[in-house]
Amino acid sequence: MLPKLLTSIFGSRNERLLKQYRRVVDQINALEPQFEQLGDDELRAKTEAFKQRVADGETLDQLLPEAFAVVREGSKRALKMRHFDVQLIGGMTLHNGKIGEMRTGEGKTLMATLPVYLNALAGKGVHVVTVNDYLARRDAEWMGRLYNFLGLTVGVNGPQMTREAKQAAYAADVTYGTNNEFGFDYLRDNMVTEVADRVQRSLNFAIVDEVDSILIDEARTPLIISGQAEDQTELYLRINAVAPLLKKQIGEADPRTGEGVIEAGDFTADEKTHQVVLTEAGHEHAEALLAQAGLLVEGASLYDAANITLMHHLYAALRARHLYHRDQHYVVQNGEVVIVDEFTGRLMTGRRWSDGLHQAVEAKEGVPIQAENQTLASITFQNYFRMYGKLAGMTGTADTEAYEFQEIYGLETVVIPPNKPTQRRDELDLVYKTSRERYEAVVKDIQDCYERGQPVLVGTTSIENSELISKLLEKYKLPHEVLNAKQHAREAEIIAQAGRPKAVTIATNMAGRGTDIVLGGNVEKQVQFIEADDAIPADDKLRRIQQLKDEWAGLHEQVKAAGGLRIVATERHESRRIDNQLRGRSGRQGDPGASRFYLSLEDPLMRIFAGDRVKAIMERLKMPDGEAIEAGIVSRSIEGAQRKVEARNFDIRKQLLEYDDVSNDQRKVIYQQRNDILESKELGAQIAHLRRGAMTDVVRTFVPVESVEEQWDIPGLEKVLRDEWQLDVPIAAQVDKSDAITDEDLVEMVAKTADETYAGKVALVGEEQFSGFERAVLLQSIDTHWREHLAALDYLRQGIHLRGYAQKNPKQEYKREAFELFSTLLDTVKMDVTRLLMTVRIRSTEEVTQAAEALEEKAEAISNLTYTHPTEDGGVAVEADPATEVANRMAEVPRAGRNDPCPCGSGKKYKQCHGRLA
């Protein structure tokens, strides 16, 4: 009660913001007559003047009224479109880093030009993010006319572009592209081995179009770049030879009595969970067998950190041999292991078991072993977009998800009023007992609209339902178009004409999104075709264009008289927002329209959440077959069900983010280290810091902190330094000579000797030459161990929920163990880099250059890169890297060395020319 009272007195937060923005709109409108007097060149010159004022310290907020007035005037001249006052309000909303909810057809694309222009004046770049490549190119070409007219440059960042083309796109003042491509470029930039290969600038300001689709619907699937790891065929074959020598235990021991074992063995196998566990005796037997096979050092344990992968491979081999059976779980076809779906019995061609199990089965069956896929880099959209200095978004439907935008991204949602009040009539839902009755009613409604000349958009939740309705319409001989969000350019054209009289268009939720449905059809497209045709004389062009416009005006009035665009929805989506998006396609710019949802008790949402209640009402009213129930209580029940699903989905996304935040913090540290290494001209201090840490760790293994001489193992320390680090340090002699030597003195002595030895090595070839080798060693080590760390985090994540059974908080356990894994990663990099640099024997400049290039080539040797990303229809796509495909086609050609002249004859080095594609 009190919040409502306060709102009625002071107005809501949304109303107060709109009031504040309207005051600025008055200032912009007052400037319009002044800017109308300027010539085109004078208007364009304003851009340079604004840039200078920003450089001199003026803020963008101070420039806003003038800049918005310039964009509005430029748009009138370049696009023949004038920004409405509500679009100016929307522009301010986006500039202030908020989400603007603007109804479909109110001109979001044009609205975005205002904050884009203003923020581009700072010279740091602005990214406009769209849901698909077609929209990115369309908007860049369409709005690019305005930006170019005002003196700004525009770039399009698309897939399959060369590095140089991407760098040019990012260097532009305004860059259009898809969410997937921006994210993948960020990941690729953090995999390069040279600064010149990076494409992105700093992440300054992004405006996300259809922000709900990108930041909510697609946020459950991370972006992943993966590639084939190093070939471990030999290891799989050798472990496959060990697995048959281990005996399966029959029966399981009771933890209290120890009874229950029928026949003792080396491991137990659980057919239900498909897991194996070694017994105590089995561990000892396995260690002995692995040592005999030369896979395990004599006396080492399978539990040692260094042998974790060995244990993993042994378990995979035992599972493959005892729990996965040919012609039950898989078949062998054409020399490949193909998985059989245990529920349907169908072959799942192309699918592979993870964790090395598939390779273990291949080794068991004696077919060629295919390399394991390894995650090279990954990031969620939540964590990528939160890196921008300023983030804004626009959509037709955000208010239902306002809480999530605020909670996850810190983005406030502002509902922007329409330019003209809506005239769309949203009718109550009709609920039928069966799907068959529902579809009959849908077809009847479509037939009625078709006969009256009213255009219909039929919304479905799946491609399967689209095709079902299409078949029903064919049966009744009703002409129609079907869109499934697959061919964006063609679908945009069909959607643009979906407002013509008698048009029937069936579309899944996402199909044709971003394109307005204009009543009477889209005359602009047809005008563009005539203008682009050079064969038509100029006078004839004008006559034809006028004829088209007159014809359209007649059709427009005809459709308005028939009731505007009718939305017929065949099912409720689990999200109210997506239902609202469908409704919002009708009634644009104050046009008439209508919408209705046809439901059945067999729909998943009804069945799970509201079915029993509605069924009881139907039975009480004794509804005959084919009759529908139409009541507010039903619609409210369904909305309540949708709220429950939305809350559950929000919890899933929030939980995903909480886990990903752990790896994100670690990702930032690793990527920052990589960037420091790439940009640093001299790595001596960094290497010295690592060397000091490594030497301290080695000494502390034999000489504990604050210990006395009797506790020191001097012979052991001298042996390790000599054998593993090639350091001859006379520690024993020094200890005998001195009366008061401490453990700290020993650390100093070893560190000093290591520094002197290393300095001598660097002096042989020169500091500048050796620095390139140091950089290659550091990057190679960080990248290799980071990939292994990502796999380790993945393993940890998959089983962490089981900690709940032990009364432990899985999230806290994940954070703690992930931190321990990360500390181990940093220690491993420190020891690996120092050991390699201390023990490598380099005597000439040529040797150091060759060694650095060999490491770079190894870093680039990861093959068959694939990109995993969410799709608009809610699925997940896995695409091959175009550069990898080119490299595979070139594989038969003898490869040139990195520094050899490129075979194409350009005169450049191979690595700077076609070597980049490989």
UniProtKB/Swiss-Prot annotation:
InterPro entries: Helicase_ATP-bd, Helicase_C-like, P-loop_NTPase, SEC_C_motif, SecA, SecA_CS, SecA_DEAD, SecA_motor_DEAD. ATP binds at residues 87, 105-109, 516. It is found in: Cell inner membrane; Cytoplasm. Keywords: ATP-binding, Cell inner membrane, Cell membrane, Cytoplasm, Membrane, Metal-binding, Nucleotide-binding, Protein transport, Translocase, Translocation, Transport, Zinc. One of its GO terms (cellular component) is cell envelope Sec protein transport complex. Its main location: membrane. It catalyses: ATP + H2O + cellular proteinSide 1 = ADP + phosphate + cellular proteinSide 2. May bind 1 zinc ion per subunit. Its EC number is 7.4.2.8. Its cofactor is Zn(2+). Zn(2+) binds at residues 902, 904, 913-914. One of its GO terms (biological process) is protein import. It is a peripheral membrane protein. It comes from the Bacteria. It is an enzyme of class 7 (translocase). The keyword Transport applies. GO terms for molecular function: ATP binding; metal ion binding; protein-exporting ATPase activity. Coiled coil: none annotated. Monomer and homodimer. Part of the essential Sec protein translocation apparatus which comprises SecA, SecYEG and auxiliary proteins SecDF-YajC and YidC. Belongs to the SecA family. Part of the Sec protein translocase complex. Interacts with the SecYEG preprotein conducting channel. Has a central role in coupling the hydrolysis of ATP to the transfer of proteins into and across the cell membrane, serving both as a receptor for the preprotein-SecB complex and as an ATP-driven molecular motor driving the stepwise translocation of polypeptide chains across the membrane. This is Protein translocase subunit SecA.
